[in-house]
Amino acid sequence: MSFTTRSTTFSTNYRSLGSVRTPSQRVRPASSAASVYAGAGGSGSRISVSRSVWGGSVGSAGLAGMGGIQTEKETMQDLNDRLASYLDKVKSLETENRRLESKIREHLEKKGPQGVRDWGHYFKIIEDLRAQIFANSVDNARIVLQIDNARLAADDFRVKYETELAMRQSVESDIHGLRKVVDDTNITRLQLETEIEALKEELLFMKKNHEEEVQGLEAQIASSGLTVEVDAPKSQDLSKIMADIRAQYEALAQKNREELDKYWSQQIEESTTVVTTKSAEIRDAETTLTELRRTLQTLEIDLDSMKNQNINLENSLGDVEARYKAQMEQLNGVLLHLESELAQTRAEGQRQAQEYEALLNIKVKLEAEIATYRRLLEDGEDFSLNDALDSSNSMQTVQKTTTRKIVDGRVVSETNDTRVLRH
């Protein structure tokens, strides 16, 4: 049996590539300020652009940045196109003015001799109008640019407004709580004032009763004709006492009011400080949240692309597996068919070999008998019957050698070698 082995060699040529320079890219914020200035006559146009640039490598989080750069470029291109159109319009108006001036001169030359009328003041008016037209064109371009800048500033202020609105709502909630405390303080103050009024009325009533009792006693003394001298201390001035009490209560109320004002002013200052601190922390947290959201969006986009790539690879793998499975089934069918044919061929070969061996034995026997008969006929009387019997009883061995060459499970060639051995 001989076997052939097929080997396939794949060679890959690598060619060195030249160094490729990749231009550096920067991510710029969407906010920018631009100004346009055009000189007289449409010449010397100058465009100045100021942007706040934040350096950053272009990576997975650079999609929003690239969109902002594209928007800026489109905006500046639009402004430049508008400015160019205005300048072209100014130039066309100047050309039209020169054409009209030439027509006026030709008309004057045809109608009458030169120098009849002085058109200098008209030329001055024309120059003034031309200057006004150019100034208006420049003003229009400047206004358009200011409108665009105002739109960008409005967007910035909108963001600031939303931030300040959140801060204002927080402060309003704090103020609402403080107003409740102030209302409670006012209620307490009203209660104290009511008590003061009640005490005043009670004091007046007691003073009136005291005066009536004094008058009654004086009348009794006068009617009895007695003179009674009482060594008593001088009566106190009730109005002065009331004034002192009122002053004390007012001083106490003023002191309480000042203490409350001071306390709530301090509380408001502390609340304002806390609100300012919390606002800064909130802004930092919002910035961090924005960056995290941008990173999350970038990662989600990468994940979606990876999922799509994985799905495509799985589909390709399924197609390849199905194709190779079909090929393997086909090859297995061919192999089974070849194995069955090989088994049939081997069985047929064995059967033919057995038949050939039987026929060969018969042939050998016949040849031996023919040789014996030939010797009997040729030798005649010299060949005895015993010799013929010995010749016929002699033992013969037939040696058969079969050589087959099989390549890839298929019989390519077959060689048979037969030898007869006598004993």
UniProtKB/Swiss-Prot annotation:
Residues 72-107 are annotated as: Coil 1A. The record marks 231-232 as: Cleavage. The modification N-acetylserine is found at residue 2. Residues 69-121 are annotated as: Interaction with TRADD. Residues 236-384 are annotated as: Interaction with DNAJB6. Residues 218-241 are annotated as: Linker 12. Keywords: Acetylation, Coiled coil, Cytoplasm, Glycoprotein, Intermediate filament, Isopeptide bond, Keratin, Methylation, Nucleus, Phosphoprotein, Ubl conjugation. There is a cross-link at residues 73, 240, 363, 365 (Glycyl lysine isopeptide (Lys-Gly) (interchain with G-Cter in SUMO2)). It comes from the Eukaryota. Heterotetramer of two type I and two type II keratins. KRT18 associates with KRT8. Interacts with PLEC isoform 1C, when in a heterodimer with KRT8. Interacts with PNN and mutated CFTR. Interacts with YWHAE, YWHAH and YWHAZ only when phosphorylated. Interacts with the thrombin-antithrombin complex. Interacts with DNAJB6, TCHP and TRADD. Interacts with FAM83H. Interacts with EPPK1. Interacts with PKP1 and PKP2. This is Keratin, type I cytoskeletal 18. It comes from Mus musculus (Mouse).
